[in-house]
Design a protein with these regions (language model features):
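Short beta-strand/turn micro-motifs composed of small residues
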Residues: 12, 70, 111-112, 162, ...
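Residues at secondary-structure transition points
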Residues: 77-81, 86-90, 111, 131-139, ...
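Conserved N-terminal catalytic core of the sugar/cofactor nucleotidyltransferase
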Residues: 93-157, 171
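N-terminal glycine-rich phosphate-binding loop and ensuing alpha1 helix
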Residues: 62-114
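Conserved beta-loop-beta/alpha segment of the NTase-like Rossmann-fold superfamily
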Residues: 134-211
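Conserved alpha/beta core of the MobA/IspD/sugar-nucleotide pyrophosphorylase nucleotidyltransferase superfamily
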Residues: 62, 66, 208, 212-268
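Well-ordered secondary-structure scaffolds
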Residues: 1-61
């Protein structure tokens, strides 16, 4: 093996002598110079990617908000859906934990009065009361958007998620934020193949139309109107599933065929 002062090469090779105080080296300085260039290039590439990610985060932090809708009546589920546990974790806790991950973005939970207010604050999430859940998901969306803009008038966009979508990956959410920051004026949503679903991030260009929505319809009609502005972040099929009825719960014996994309999310 090649040995230099303080450096051992080929530590995993059979017969290598290892003595106390010796260090493990990755590069034999006597190796061909092209090897050094290759390793250096890789280091620069990794460093460049990290720098790019940090720069993008600095551009996004505080400029986008994260709103989770959780004021639905849960009529089809037949009970308190938000406290229903999956793998021992209630749906609302899963939602709060997801928002906590994105601490650089102001986060809001739209729910019924007195519902999860303390829990939301414990996770650094601002609770927003919906006293009229019977008005549908559009009313919750409007309340969340108005509160986010009241606290942050210069927002570039708002990401809307739903509380009953337990398997959405934070990495997918991060990619939605990244895509929105790189493509201003877009509507960015999660999707699987040709299907679209939640979460959806809306650029501020669409805020006025969002506040004009009525009833139990989400933003699908607006997305249809601006098809050329929609960008889809591909996610796993399971990520897009939501919990509408008890049969949608794991182990209930019914595989959900429909993804949560009729209204781009039914509110929990």
């Amino acid at each position: 093996y090649a040995q230099m002062p303080g450096i051992v090469r080929g530590l995993l090779q059979e017969g290598t002598e290892v003595r106390k105080g010796l260090k493990i080296g990755d590069i034999d300085a006597r190796a061909h110079s092209s090897y050094c260039h290759t390793i250096s290039d890789k280091a620069r590439a990794v460093g460049g990617a990290v720098l790019e990610a940090v720069s993008l985060y600095e551009k996004m932090a505080g400029r986008y908000a994260f709103v989770t809708l959780a004021a639905g009546l849960g009529t089809r589920f037949g009970g308190n859906k938000l406290e229903t546990e999956i793998d021992g974790i209630p749906l609302y806790v899963r939602a709060l934990r997801r928002m906590q991950i994105f601490g650089g973005f102001p986060s809001y939970l739209v729910a019924a009065p007195g519902c999860m207010e303390k829990e939301a604050l414990d996770y650094g999430v601002v609770p927003v009361e919906n006293r009229e859940p019977e008005r549908g998901i559009s009313h919750s969306l409007k309340l969340g958007l108005e509160r986010a803009l009241k606290d942050n008038p210069d927002l570039k966009g708002v990401l809307f998620s739903v509380c009953d979508q337990p398997w959405i990956d934070p990495a997918t959410i991060q990619q939605i934020f990244n895509t929105a920051a790189l493509h201003p004026g877009s509507i960015v949503c999660a999707g699987c193949g040709d299907s679209r679903g939640n979460p959806v991030l809306w650029d501020r260009a669409y805020f006025l139309e969002l506040t004009a929505l009525e009833g139990d319809r989400g933003g699908k009609q607006i997305m249809e109107k601006y098809r050329d502005k929609v960008r889809v972040v591909q996610a796993g099929e399971k990520e897009l599933r939501d919990i509408d009825v008890r049969e949608d719960l794991p182990g209930a014996g019914r595989r959900k065929e429909r993804r949560g994309d009729e209204n781009y999310g039914s509110e929990a």
